[in-house]
Amino acid sequence: AACCEKESLPVTPTSSDLQFGHLAKTWDEGIPLGNATVGTLVWQRDSVLRFSLDRTDLWDLRPMDSIAGPNNRFAWVCEQVRKGDYLPVQKKFDHPYNALPAPSKIPGAALEFPLNIGKVSSVHLFLNNALCEVLWENGTKLQTFVHADEPVGWFVFENLLDTVSPEIIAPRYSNPDEIAGDNSHAGPALGRLGYKQG
């Protein structure tokens, strides 16, 4: 949800708050907000403000033969390591996953704000309020948070000189160029699941 309130949301600073002089440039360093169901990372991708959105229940849970059966135990993996023969473990888990990475976490979407308002002067995560506040040198302020119990979040801009239209960005479900050279479980495995780009 978006708000256009004139007044700032109340915050209570603490000595444990996270404070930075700029927005993170990568998703994994973004300001985390969330609850047990939904979450977001607040960061800057290229020149846009980006909220990486996710849900804990977005999974591809199609059955995989490789993780079924009696050898689907950590004790079995440890036994192979003790024997000095890790190849059976790779054949059972890694090789099938490289072909079809399921079960797999599916990422949510992103919300991007194409703001041309200059340089960020501060980023503050108020831990007591679970609220992120971003200030720009021109006086623009963003406050955003995720509700503690409900699967919903809010953002409020103040002193925004022009209207801004956020854009919803779907995950890249298919990108053959990335898939061909990827051999990491954290990489673009989503493309190997066979979903059509929406």
What feature does the model see in each segment?
Residues 8-198:
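Aromatic-residue-lined binding/catalytic grooves and analogous aromatic/hydrophobic interfacial grooves
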